[in-house]
């Protein structure tokens, strides 16, 4: 379970990734966000989408994002430093 600080970080990062503010992260939005972290290929984006988009609807919901973030705390700390 994420504490309040961790939840606030997840909220902040999710909003940065969700460029159009529709409450979900599309593959295009994920690609743009990942470009901030360095070079990213279309295959990288596909792999990340496949891993995070657990319901397979083509978008990353807030719940899917927080589930991934909770399982990958070290990675999310690194992402939080950049965003």
Swiss-Prot record:
Q: Which UniProt keywords apply?
A: Calcium, Metal-binding, Repeat
Q: Name one GO cellular component term.
A: cytoplasm
Checking SMART domains in the record gives:
EFh
User: Is the keyword Calcium in the record?
Assistant: yes
Q: Which residues bind Ca(2+) 1?
A: 18, 20, 22, 24, 29
Give the source's domain of life in one word.
Eukaryota
User: What range(s) does the EF-hand domain occupy?
Assistant: 5-40, 43-75
What InterPro entries would the database entry show?
EF-hand-dom_pair, EF_Hand_1_Ca_BS, EF_hand_dom, EF_hand_pair_protein_CML-like
Q: Name one GO molecular function term.
A: calcium ion binding
- Residues recorded as binding Ca(2+) 2, renumbered to this chain, are 53, 55, 57, 59, 64
- Has the keyword Repeat been applied to this entry? yes
Alphabetized PROSITE patterns for the sequence: EF_HAND_1, EF_HAND_2
Q: What does this protein do?
A: Potential calcium sensor.
- Protein name, entry field: Probable calcium-binding protein CML29
Q: Which organism is it from?
A: Arabidopsis thaliana
Name the lineage.
Answer: Eukaryota, Viridiplantae, Streptophyta, Embryophyta, Tracheophyta
Identify the coding gene.
Answer: CML29
């Amino acid at each position: 379970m994420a504490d309040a600080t961790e939840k606030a970080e997840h909220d902040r990062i999710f909003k940065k990734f969700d460029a159009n503010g529709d409450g979900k992260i599309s593959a295009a939005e994920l690609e743009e966000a990942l470009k901030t972290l360095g070079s990213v290929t279309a295959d990288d984006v596909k792999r990340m989408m496949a891993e995070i988009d657990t319901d397979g609807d083509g978008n990353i919901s807030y719940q899917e994002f927080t589930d991934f973030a909770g399982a990958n705390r070290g990675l999310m700390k690194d992402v939080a430093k950049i965003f």
